[in-house]
Structures are given as structure tokens and as C-alpha cells.
Amino acid sequence: MRRVLVVAGSDSGGGAGVQADLKTLLACGVHGTTVITAVTAQNSLGVHGVWEVPVDAVRAQLAAVLDDLGTDAVKTGMLAGAATVQAVVDAVTGLPGPLVVDPVGLSTTGAPLHTPKALALLRQALLPLATVVTPNLAEVEQLTGVVVARAGDLRRGAGAMLELGPRWVLLKGGHLPGEPVDLLTDGTTYELLRAPRVDTRHTHGTGCTLASALAAHLARGSDVPQAAAAAKEFVSRAIAAGFPLGRGAGPVHQVAEQHPHPPLAGSVSVNVRGKPPHSC
């Protein structure tokens, strides 16, 4: 079985972070291993506390996984502190498999999840190693200063991200007005990934799910455009199956094929041939 190493924070509510990553990886048919970088106290109403895991513990987890189990791809999420970012850079430098970086720079309420030093190191040392980086609009602004306010700004925002060194950018435009559209580019080719907008507030874990599905397909041998298309379809169906949990925004549902529900209205324009509904 193919392996994906996730380096990210824990979500006590189970909707995002490594919890969402592991559900996604299982649904996509790969084995997920984890390095916990931070523990968060969060639920459907928001993030109520963040505690960084000591960097020695982060390094020990990285060594334990990589020295014995190995990995076919790495996906990073919330890294929090500069020492943790450096530990990840040290561990992934020279690894042969793809690296997916989800910058996870801001909470849903807009609170920063990286220290200023960590953010600088992310720009300077981790992003140049990335096969694909998957920022949302707020993270593009945080990392580059470029504001993406409409679909016409997507190329400019993605171009600014490419200047930081990743090979590909998958810029998530779900918060733009109109039809949700993401832009995948390596600076030479540009592909728009579209899906119908789903009228729901139950979207917790969307970014983690997309990035982990992308990493899973890369680990299974897909090229970046194929993996991005498959990940887009997977997350679109997970959003359509999102469910209420708690008093706020509920999570997306990565394993909805086990729990039938009304189909997604319309069809995602990046269908993966031969895959049944709600599969990865």
C-alpha cells in the first residue's frame, strides 16, 4: 500500500487537521502516517487554543516514521513555529517523493496560525521544496501581499506564489463570488478546476481534505494535473455530503459513499473515469 506522511496539527473536533487528513487518505486507498506539530482545542465554533508540540518531539516523530516506514509523499499543514518548520525542511530535503504544502496560515476567524519567523521560513525554505502548494485567497495575501478579489486575479495571485519556488500552485478560489473555481498552474500551463457551488455551511476541513487527496493521488503515481482533478472531485463530493455537528460549521464527509445521500446537483467538470460516486 502507498504511504503518505502528514505533518500537521490535531483538531479536537475531528473536522480538520490530521483527523481530516487520515479520513481522506483512507478513502483514497493509501496508508497515512502522522507527525503532530500542534494540539488545538477547537470545535464547530472556532479555535479556542493552540499548543505547539516541542520540536524534539516533532523531530522524533519524523525520524520514527521515515527511518522505518518510509513514505511515498508528504503533506504538510499547520506547522506553527519556526523550529518546527526547520525540522520539516531538514527531514524532507532529499526525499524522492512529492511534497504538498497546505500553508494553513490563518484560522477561520482570521487569527494567524504561524509566528512571523515561521512564516518567513515557510516562504524561504519550505515552499521552494514543494511539488504543489495549495493556498486559499487569504493565504496568498498573507504570503505575497497580493489580493485576489475576483476570478481575473487568480493568475496574478498564483504567479506571486510561484515566485516563492514551488513547482505548481493550486490556488483555491472557493470564496470568490460566483461559481467556485480553482487555478492549477506551473507558470506555463493554466487549468481551471470548476465545481457547482453547494449551499452549505458545513465545510470544516475542506482545505485539509483537498491537499491530502492530492497527496494521495500523487503517491499513487498520478501526475500533478491528474491528481489535482481527482482531488477537486473528491473534495466537492465531500462538501456536498457535509453534515451538521455542534452549533457552528460542521465537517465535510470524506467517506460519504458508505452513507447514501442525495447526489450533488450538477456534475463536477473534472470527473475521474471509472470512479463510482463519492470515491477517491
At which residue positions do the language-model features occur?
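Short, small-residue alpha-helix embedded
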Residues: 19, 24, 141-142, 201-224
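Glycine- and other small-residue-rich loops at beta-strand/loop junctions that grip anionic moieties
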Residues: 10, 76-77, 111, 203
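Conserved phosphate/ATP/ADP-binding segment of small-molecule kinases
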Residues: 113-190
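Short, charged, surface-exposed loops that flank catalytic or proteolytic processing sites
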Residues: 146-155, 219-229
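Charged C-terminal helix
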Residues: 52, 225-280
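Nucleotide and nucleotide-moiety/phosphate-recognizing core
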Residues: 72, 83-96, 167, 181, ...
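Short pre-catalytic strand/loop immediately N-terminal to key active-site residues, enriched for Gly-Thr
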Residues: 7-13, 191-204
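Conserved N-terminal subdomain of the carbohydrate kinase-like
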Residues: 1-6, 18, 22-108
